[in-house]
Amino acid sequence: MAVRFLFEALQKAIDEEMEREKRVVLIGEDIGHYGGSYKVTQGLYGKYGKHRVIDTPIAEYSFVGAAVGAAATGLIPVVEGMNMAFILLAYSQISNNMGMLCATSGGHFQVPMVLRGPGGIGKQLGAEHSQRLESYFQSVPGLQIVTCSTPYNAKGLLKSAIRSKNPILFIEHVLLYNLKGEVPDNDYLLPLEKAELVREGSDITVLTYSRQRYNVIQAVKVLVEEGYDPEVIDLISLKPFDMETIGKSIQKTHKVLIVEECMMTGGISNVLQSLIIDNFFDALDAAPLILSSPNVPTPYTGPLEEATVVQTIDIIESIEYGITGKPPKPRTAKK
């Protein structure tokens, strides 16, 4: 068992899968000689060469399309988008080809590929590089969406994604690459469609994913000291949702709060809230609550940037309100 940064866990996953299966190839901007913007592919060009680690121009539409073709004809591409905001330039390829080709070809072509890279709000990266776009891709037929949040699940999930026969959007958070954690040295896989029960509780079900997992954990620590008992679930799979795990928790707590970094309009939480109401209405004591980011571009300056992201104090107050139904008590904590 080694302690690794999250980016190192991703690197290890890719390395192991490239060594195991010669059809796995890497495609993307600056992934070869440079080793990737966040060093996830560092060292792989030297080990596997230019035919398996392919540097591309800054042309997302073209290299995602090339990867779809490669996947349909027998390879297993792992594509790095330097920033998820600019993967939008390849949206037509993702929607019309990556997601739907298997169905539109009557099953003649499969598209076993992974499109991965950083998303979320970083530290003063500016509006264009601070977008949360997972909900943009949720409506693409045939596309799975997976998020990682720890070095342990990053490695296990990415290995599973590479071995899957489905096209997968694998979202990493820019602020989690330097997160440290224990990662087994052995070959292990984690299920792509399974949520993680982070903390058992009985008062309310808190659903979250990616970076907000850690803000939720900090909020729960404060509330536990005050006598509250929230249950915390890391969704991991954003499409499809693990409704079995979610439902089991709701049957116990009867209250729900969804915490996300997406914007409040059209976010992941809107779809999840609807599914919860449709499937578990009779188990709910109140409507599921949503805590999302405001509908504004992310400012560059630090204090304003922070104001556009859900903070720990927001989560504390929302959980308390969800449990008691009363306005939260005044607190001085800001994070």
Curated annotation (Swiss-Prot):
The subcellular localization recorded is: Plastid, Chloroplast
Membrane spanning stretches:
none
Cofactor(s) the protein needs = thiamine diphosphate
Which UniProt keywords are listed? Answer: Chloroplast, Metal-binding, Oxidoreductase, Plastid, Potassium, Pyruvate, Thiamine pyrophosphate
Which InterPro entries does this entry report, sorted A to Z? THDP-binding, Transketo_C/PFOR_II, Transketolase-like_Pyr-bd, Transketolase_C
Q: What is this protein called?
A: Pyruvate dehydrogenase E1 component subunit beta
Under the GO molecular function aspect, what terms does this record hold? Answer: metal ion binding; pyruvate dehydrogenase (acetyl-transferring) activity
SUPFAM superfamilies reported for this sequence: Thiamin diphosphate-binding fold (THDP-binding) (SSF52518), TK C-terminal domain-like (SSF52922)
> In which organism is this protein found?
Chlorokybus atmophyticus (Soil alga)
Quaternary context: Heterodimer of an alpha and a beta chain.
What is the residue range of the signal peptide feature? none
Q: Which Pfam families match?
A: Transket_pyr (PF02779), Transketolase_C (PF02780)
